[in-house]
Amino acid sequence: MKDTLGNLSLDEKIGQVFVDMLWNNTNDEIKERINKYGIGGFRYNNMSPEQLYEQNKIIQETSKIPALIAANIEAGGDGGVKGGTHFGYHVTIGATQNKENAYKLGYYGCKEVAAIGCNWTFAPIVDINKNWRNCVVSNRCFSSEADVVLEMSKEYLQGAKDAGLASCMKHFPGDGLDERDQHIVTTNN
């Protein structure tokens, strides 16, 4: 690892902390971004399994260090690949009161996207739903009860880990109170 990092330029080391959002980019554009900026992570748009497999293969072949390739595996493999299995939103899984369902969501959803080269999930959603009008988490979080969110999230995380994916819990720093979308405006949470 020391040798690998030692052989990177300062710009390439800086590039490792960035995650690039891919949106219908050509393979040549992806290669150019990696070669020019040394980007270490990618978040991609939902495409067919064949397209994603090829895209992710090119990312890894072009990168000097194995890249992180992320998707939103919140409700199943359909969050990462067209035609992937939709298991259910977090609120549906939470309503079952069965932690095994949260594990299965993490495991099987992540297993599907791992098959096409994804290795990082932007899930679980660990927000606590305190306002049913919240447009971001009202149907995307496990519960309005902190204990349920905690237990379901732990199970999801274990499932994702067992499927071979790294997980990034969200949101930032938390959502669920305000009615505004913190992806677009500053909210009061």
Model-predicted segments: where are they?
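Metal-dependent enolase-superfamily TIM-barrel catalytic cores that perform enediolate-based chemistry
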Residues: M152-E155, G159, A163
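Enzymes and membrane/adaptor proteins characterized by extended Gly/Ser/Thr/Asp/Glu-rich
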Residues: W23-T26, I30-E151, H171-N189
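Short polybasic/polar patches that bind polyanions
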Residues: G6, A114, K161
